[in-house]
Design a protein with these regions (language model features):
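C-terminal functional regions that serve as terminal interaction/effector modules
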Residues: 2-13, 17, 284-364
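Acidic, serine/threonine- and glycine-rich low-complexity intrinsically disordered segments
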Residues: 148-267, 271
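Short, hydrophobic/aromatic beta-strand segments
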Residues: 83-85, 94-102, 163, 175-181, ...
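Intrinsically disordered, low-complexity Pro/Gly/Ser/Thr-rich segments with frequent PxxP/GP/PP motifs
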Residues: 115-158, 313-343
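Asparagine-centered strand-capping/turn motif at beta-strand->loop junctions
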Residues: 74-82, 87-107, 167-171, 283-288, ...
Length: 364
């Protein structure tokens, strides 16, 4: 288990109103993000066939290498074990490619357990900290026009499989552009070779669970300036819509519309930004005449929340925060005189609810 990062302490608070929205946001890391979380529950209704593709990322690129992150989150309620895995099909006639630098965290847990912590928080912390396990894919050799298997796992009935894989696709030979497909595949038979599943993805279920394939995996969010000693501020991140007017918030970047069109229709908004890194820049103005300590908290605004935060090179687990009366102080920052910026990165645990409040106060 690679998610041994220390856990911060939860507390209580009454968050200040009104909220301020994120000022602006733009994509950060160009590592691709594929999110496979719909259908989340695999049963006779959502997964009627013997096997199928849960989601895919279709890639065409002139680059010499492409970096990927794939997050999956599926619950087996089929009444029998399921085989779930990750494959890559090279569809190019002009080159061979190779899957390298694979790191992954896979959690298979009873779906009736505390999956927010046992799977979601663990995936977020290990990915954000860079402590996922190295993995030698099942097919490490160069792939021509064929399907390679990265890994397959058995998921018992009544269990969740949550995973994050990071890897790099490199050109092994040839000089033509990349054309390949990454798939999450599943089969009711343990004897099925998941390499043979090359169908289009299952239809999205009626639940609001997200899925999609985006050419980036990080949000760079700028929140409005905080003034030391002034009114306590609560900023609202990871929201579905703005508080007033209903227009999309600035940080809603992982939408069905921004999902790579090569992967076709069927994407669903990733409002909570599961699998993505959410990097916050907080401008702080200190005109008090002396350095001042500022406290930064996170506070759930849509239901139960957990995750991880990176401060510099250190990563901490954010504990389960059940209600909007719960909070976790993630940092104490000594603001110098004048204008400075405090930066930190968040990753939301699978099964969390958003929006998330970022609460800023001056230490008394």
């Amino acid at each position: 288990m690679t998610c041994k990062q220390p856990e911060l302490t939860a507390g209580k608070m009454d968050a200040a109103y009104p909220f301020q929205e994120v000022a602006s946001a733009e994509p950060g890391s160009r590592r691709r993000l594929m999110l496979s979380d719909n259908p989340e529950v695999l049963d006779t209704g959502s997964f009627p066939e013997a096997g199928g593709t849960l989601w895919h990322d279709v890639v065409q690129s002139d680059a010499d290498q492409v970096k990927h992150r794939v997050m999956g989150w599926h619950i087996n309620q089929t009444g029998q074990p399921l085989q779930v895995g990750l494959t890559l099909e090279n569809q190019s006639e002009a080159n061979t490619l190779q899957i390298r630098q694979i790191k992954r965290e896979v959690r298979i847990v009873d779906a009736s357990s505390n999956i927010l912590v046992d799977a979601g928080q663990c995936l977020a912390a290990s990915c954000l900290a860079g402590t996922m396990d190295d993995h030698a894919g099942a097919d490490c050799r160069p792939l021509a026009q064929e399907v390679g298997l990265i890994e397959a796992r058995e998921v018992p009935h009544g269990h969740l499989i949550g995973f994050i894989y990071e890897f790099t696709v490199c050109r092994s030979s040839g000089d033509g552009p990349f054309h390949y497909v990454v798939r999450t595949a599943a089969s009711r038979s343990a004897d099925t070779d998941l390499r043979t599943i090359v169908s289009e993805p299952l239809s999205a279920a009626g639940q609001p669970h997200p899925r999609g394939s985006w050419p980036f995996s990080e949000t760079l969010a700028l929140i409005p300036e905080y003034e030391v000693g002034g009114t306590t501020h609560n900023y609202r991140a990871l929201a579905k819509s703005r508080q007033f007017g209903g227009s999309p918030p600035a940080d809603l970047l992982f939408t069905a519309g921004s999902s790579d069109p090569l992967s076709g229709g069927g994407a669903v908004n990733n409002t909570a930004q599961f699998g993505a890194i959410y990097t916050v820049s907080l401008p702080i103005r200190n005109e008090t005449g002396a350095p001042a300590k500022v406290h930064i908290w996170v506070n759930p605004r849509g239901g139960k929340y957990a995750g991880a935060v990176r401060l510099g090179k250190e990563v901490f687990r954010i504990p389960v925060l059940p209600t909007n009366k719960d909070a976790c102080r993630i940092a104490e920052y000594e603001a110098p005189e004048g204008l400075s910026t405090f930066t930190f990165s968040l990753m939301t645990a699978g099964e969390s609810n958003t929006p998330l409040g970022i609460f800023v106060t001056t230490s008394s």
